């Protein structure tokens, strides 16, 4: 699955940590930065921020394609 800056993701928590982030910030997040996408050696990471305007300072990095704490439920382009 290919991601682009500006895409929206619906996330769900896998671990207690991930579930707490979803409870605090909501399940809709926006991709603001991508790192390592052009490398065959490095893993790809996506920086995401919550869609909620009041929580825009609560960014986090997601390891793609599988993150330890969160899973991507829906990719909204």
List each language-model region with its residue ranges.
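Intrinsically disordered, low-complexity, charged/polar segments
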Residues: 45-77
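Short coil-to-beta transition motif at edge beta-strands of beta-rich domains
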Residues: 2-18
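Short, solvent-exposed secondary-structure boundary/capping segments
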Residues: 38-46
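Short beta-strand segments and strand-loop junctions that repeat across beta-rich extracellular domains
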Residues: 16, 23, 50-52
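Short beta-strand-centered aromatic/proline hotspots
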Residues: 20-36
């Amino acid at each position: 699955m290919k991601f682009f800056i500006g895409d929206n993701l619906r996330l769900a928590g896998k671990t207690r940590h991930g579930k707490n982030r979803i409870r605090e910030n909501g399940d809709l997040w926006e991709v603001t930065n991508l790192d390592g996408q052009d490398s065959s050696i490095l893993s790809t990471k996506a920086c995401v921020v919550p869609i909620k305007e009041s929580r825009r300072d609560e960014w986090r990095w997601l390891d793609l394609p599988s993150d330890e704490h969160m899973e991507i439920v829906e990719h909204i382009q």
